[in-house]
Amino acid sequence: MAARQAGPDRLARMRTALLDPLKEVHGVSDKVLMMTLSILFLGAPGQRRRWREVGGSMIAVDTLVHNFLHRTGILARFRADHPYGVACYRPGGCADIIETVAQQIDARQFNRRFPATFPRFVQHAIWRYCSQQGLDICNGNQIDDRKRCDNKQCTLYSNCDRKRLHEAE
């Protein structure tokens, strides 16, 4: 039903229709649902276009992604400071911010087969920028969480607020 009604919030309605019943499963977080289902749906066969659309709209916010948004000052700029957890998925939280950013980026410039708006791609790019398995730049292994980042070689340095993750003791 949610898929049949057009409108700018169509994908959000489809996600909600799919995820809300699954949130009743005790111990399964939004992050786990988004991560698992997005991988499954993005890998759907070509004739399952709606599955791929919904999978591409699912944003999995882990601590690396949340902490990146905090350290760079993005959460503060959106007046969305909050601790990591369920607030990341509330209106105005990390997932909404990434969705907003994704609407400003044409993902087809990276791969012509991508949809123009691809929130999962933006979230994954942030994760890869931070993760040890990726570029290993913006994370607790490289930055003392009690201090501001001092990596002047970082491509984001001049636009980054370089906020501490924790107050210095």
Where are the regions a protein language model picked out?
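HhH-family (HhH-GPD) DNA N-glycosylase catalytic core used in base-excision repair
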Residues: 1-169
